[in-house]
Amino acid sequence: MHRRLAYAAAGLVLAGTVVAPAAADSLSSVSVPRGPDSPGYQLRINTARLGISVSRGGEQVLRTASDAFTFDGGVATRVRSVSRDGATVVAEADSTAGRPVTLRITPRPDRFDLSWSVGGLAAGQRATHFDLATSGYWYGGGETSEGKAQPYPLSAGVVDEPEFSPASYMMQEPYFFTSKSVGLYVRTAQPMKVALAGGRADLTVTNSAEYTSTVFVESSRRAVYDDYIGEVGKPAKSDATDAEFKSPLWNSWAQYYRDIDQDKVLSWARDLKNVGVAGHTVQLDDKWESNYGNLTFDAKTFPDPKKLADDIHAMGQKFGLWTTFWVNLDSANYAYARDHGYLVHAKGNTSTPCTVTWWNGTAGIIDLGNPQARDWYTGNLRKLMADYGVDGFKFDTRFFDDRCATTGSLTPQDYQKLGADMTDAFDQQGAGIRTHWGNQHYGFVIRAVDADTSWDGLRTSLRRASAISADGYPFVETDMIGGSNSMPPPTREVLVRWAQAASLMPLMYASTSPVSTVDTTTGKTVVYPADTAKLYADAVQTHAKLAGYLKTQVQQAVADGTPIMRPVYFDFPTDHRFDTIDDEWLLGPALLAAPMITAGTARDITLPAGLWFDPHTKRIETGGRTLHNYPAPLDTSPMFVRVGAPGWTDLVRDLTR
């Protein structure tokens, strides 16, 4: 619909094809009336000390903190003037640094663009600060750093991310949303600093002359999500195959960590097959290489990799390898890559490779900004495929490091795109790549970062997967089932419950065998009770039963970006009981997952409105209430089919057969 802005001497009102009368407000107020696709909102600029507040339907839904706009050495203060530049409201303010601050707001029907800059100041830090009390709960942003809690909601805990960046290994996204259906999208290709604590949210951009953002104002969180996806793009495809949505990827990391060899890997794969635990791929993780960056097998531990690949293929599975873009200084390839200019340069000295410390030593990084470097690296990967029958790769790496210099005019965000484009040419085998910051359109599988082998690890991994999905990456999986943080292996109960929870997600990512594993802290073998394998296999079979339903959800995600694993409040926007519930989610429109993620054999389950069929008891439960102490013995993972939802009859058939 054609829209235009109508102005009056006293105010600014967004109108449709008919000019709406302007309210008797000052130029510092903006009123956007309700429309067929937007709830309308009112925005006011605080002139005593530069800041903004947003209201919808008479309720305040967003407000900046008292020090709303800060920069290197100063904070914006009193507003000197407010004017209009076409559709844009322009506020000029003083600052404690004696420099002018210019705020520009351009209203649109369901959002407004907000940017501000400081006169005469070079690029640096620009921060916008928000008051949490008026905006409800905060969500979004993706993963918090390893070793830190993943609060749910974010505002329920402390978030401190000084390296929130396009180059981060974490799945981070400059997008946040609230329980009052407001979204904040910070438009930057540069690293940020993000903090939520003490009743405020601090969103800081670095290396920037201007802070640029879009604020969505909607009537539901799902509408905010759709607005954001409209900006960054939906998945253009699903990188994962039907087989990868049906059974787990098996990766060697948590089973053996770095203590692997050809015989161990083959024994592990055969054990899984013998107990009936399905899988589509066996991947070698860390320590198959002769050295990090060599991209050649260690002949001592893998004397015949071609035979290993053939043996895995004979079991009906693909064979894959873990790889990174780090090239260790003591590797055979480092000198070659350095001498040919294939490594990212150091800041301030483009003749010297940047040296970084990562979890396996000190290394240079393949420069994806150099086409010759990319060709050399991918040529090595294709040689592994041709020589040994390797089918694909787990790319476990950063595409750039903020400690280094970018090539030419490239930004850290550009390196994300270069890495995504390069890896998209290979079979990622359901491990996907951890690419973010506006890379939703690739349709990659995204795995949550490494988690502890405990109940807390399970909960944290589910929270992270949920956060990634709510940022527009629908093809998600937890960390390896049972966790993978170089700790003692999971208990039988944690391992089984993790498998059950993962079975009610888009994909399953596995490592620890339910037959036996190795305690990396002692070197001793841990043998699980005999029924563990059956319980695990049952979870995998449950996931297989969802294959047809999931295929439909994948098609929907590609069509319009609809998340597959999603918060219940996306489909039930007025049920605020789910604002803080992290152990229930919807898998598509028809399946409510409520797995056990704590020790025990019963739990409380919150049901949304409607009728819900329990595939285990074959009873229909009435929604809009909480089922207290609902039975969940170890062989049962609670789930409910929403009667009348798209696909519900097929789900009932498949889950009860």
Go through the PLM ranges and name each one.
Residues 47, 56, 93, 105-107, ...:
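Glycine-rich, histidine-containing beta strand-loop boundary motifs that form or position
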Residues 40, 175, 250, 272, ...:
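Conserved, mostly hydrophobic/aromatic
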Residues 141, 240-285:
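N-terminal structural segment of carbohydrate-active enzymes
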Residues 421, 441-448, 461, 470-478, ...:
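Catalytic core of carbohydrate-active enzymes
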Residues 129, 144, 151-153, 278-536, ...:
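Aromatic- and carboxylate-enriched substrate-binding clefts and catalytic-loop regions
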